[in-house]
Amino acid sequence: MTAHANERISDVSPSARGSSSESKYDKLCRVLFFIAITKSSFTPEHILYKHSIFTDKPILADIVTFMYAAFVSIGWFLIWGERAYRTQEMGQPPMYSNINYHLLSFKKRHPKKFTCALWLVFFLAYTVLTVLIWLVQLIFRKGNVFQMLLQLIILDIAIALVNVAIAFTFEIYLSQKAAIEIRDEGLNNLDTA
């Protein structure tokens, strides 16, 4: 390679190059975490309904399964938050640009209502996701196999839809936050000039 080509390559910022600066280990860890959380939320944990500690004390089983569902839901929030943040850092445009424009105008008119509504959506999504995962964990306590499989499929579809809503909300949250910060920086630069 010539010196001119090396100079042109070094001028490209890491965000413009994409995720090439990310190590293979980081990618592998992220994929393994995604697989573990997906498995934990879409399939029941056998130990929670077969171990004698949980079969003898159903109240303990309910508490442990609810705590398990809460931690798995936190894992989903970590996945979608990190993915939205990484997308924003790479400089990719938001997927929902028209919706973001309307939300940005709403945020300009009512900033406190917008923030409150967004956090309410996060809380409701977390609550619904936790309850759905909890129901998946409790599904094998019933006897009818066909009914259990049908309920499992319905609950898995509901979990997937809630995850789409969470991903969408994180993207809106981060893109609106970035749009406001960029606009504020532009106004500050005009004031100093």
From Swiss-Prot:
Residues 12-21 have a biased composition (Polar residues). Residues 1-21 are annotated as: Disordered. It is a multi-pass membrane protein. The keyword Membrane applies. Keywords: Cell cycle, Membrane, Transmembrane, Transmembrane helix. Residues 1-58, 141-147 are extracellular. Residues 1-10 have a biased composition (Basic and acidic residues). GO terms for cellular component: membrane. Its main location: membrane. InterPro entries: DUF4668 (IPR031427). It holds the Pfam family DUF4668. It is found in: Membrane. The chain crosses the membrane at residues 59-79, 120-140, 148-168. Residues 80-119, 169-193 are cytoplasmic. The keyword Transmembrane helix applies. This is Uncharacterized membrane protein YPL257W.
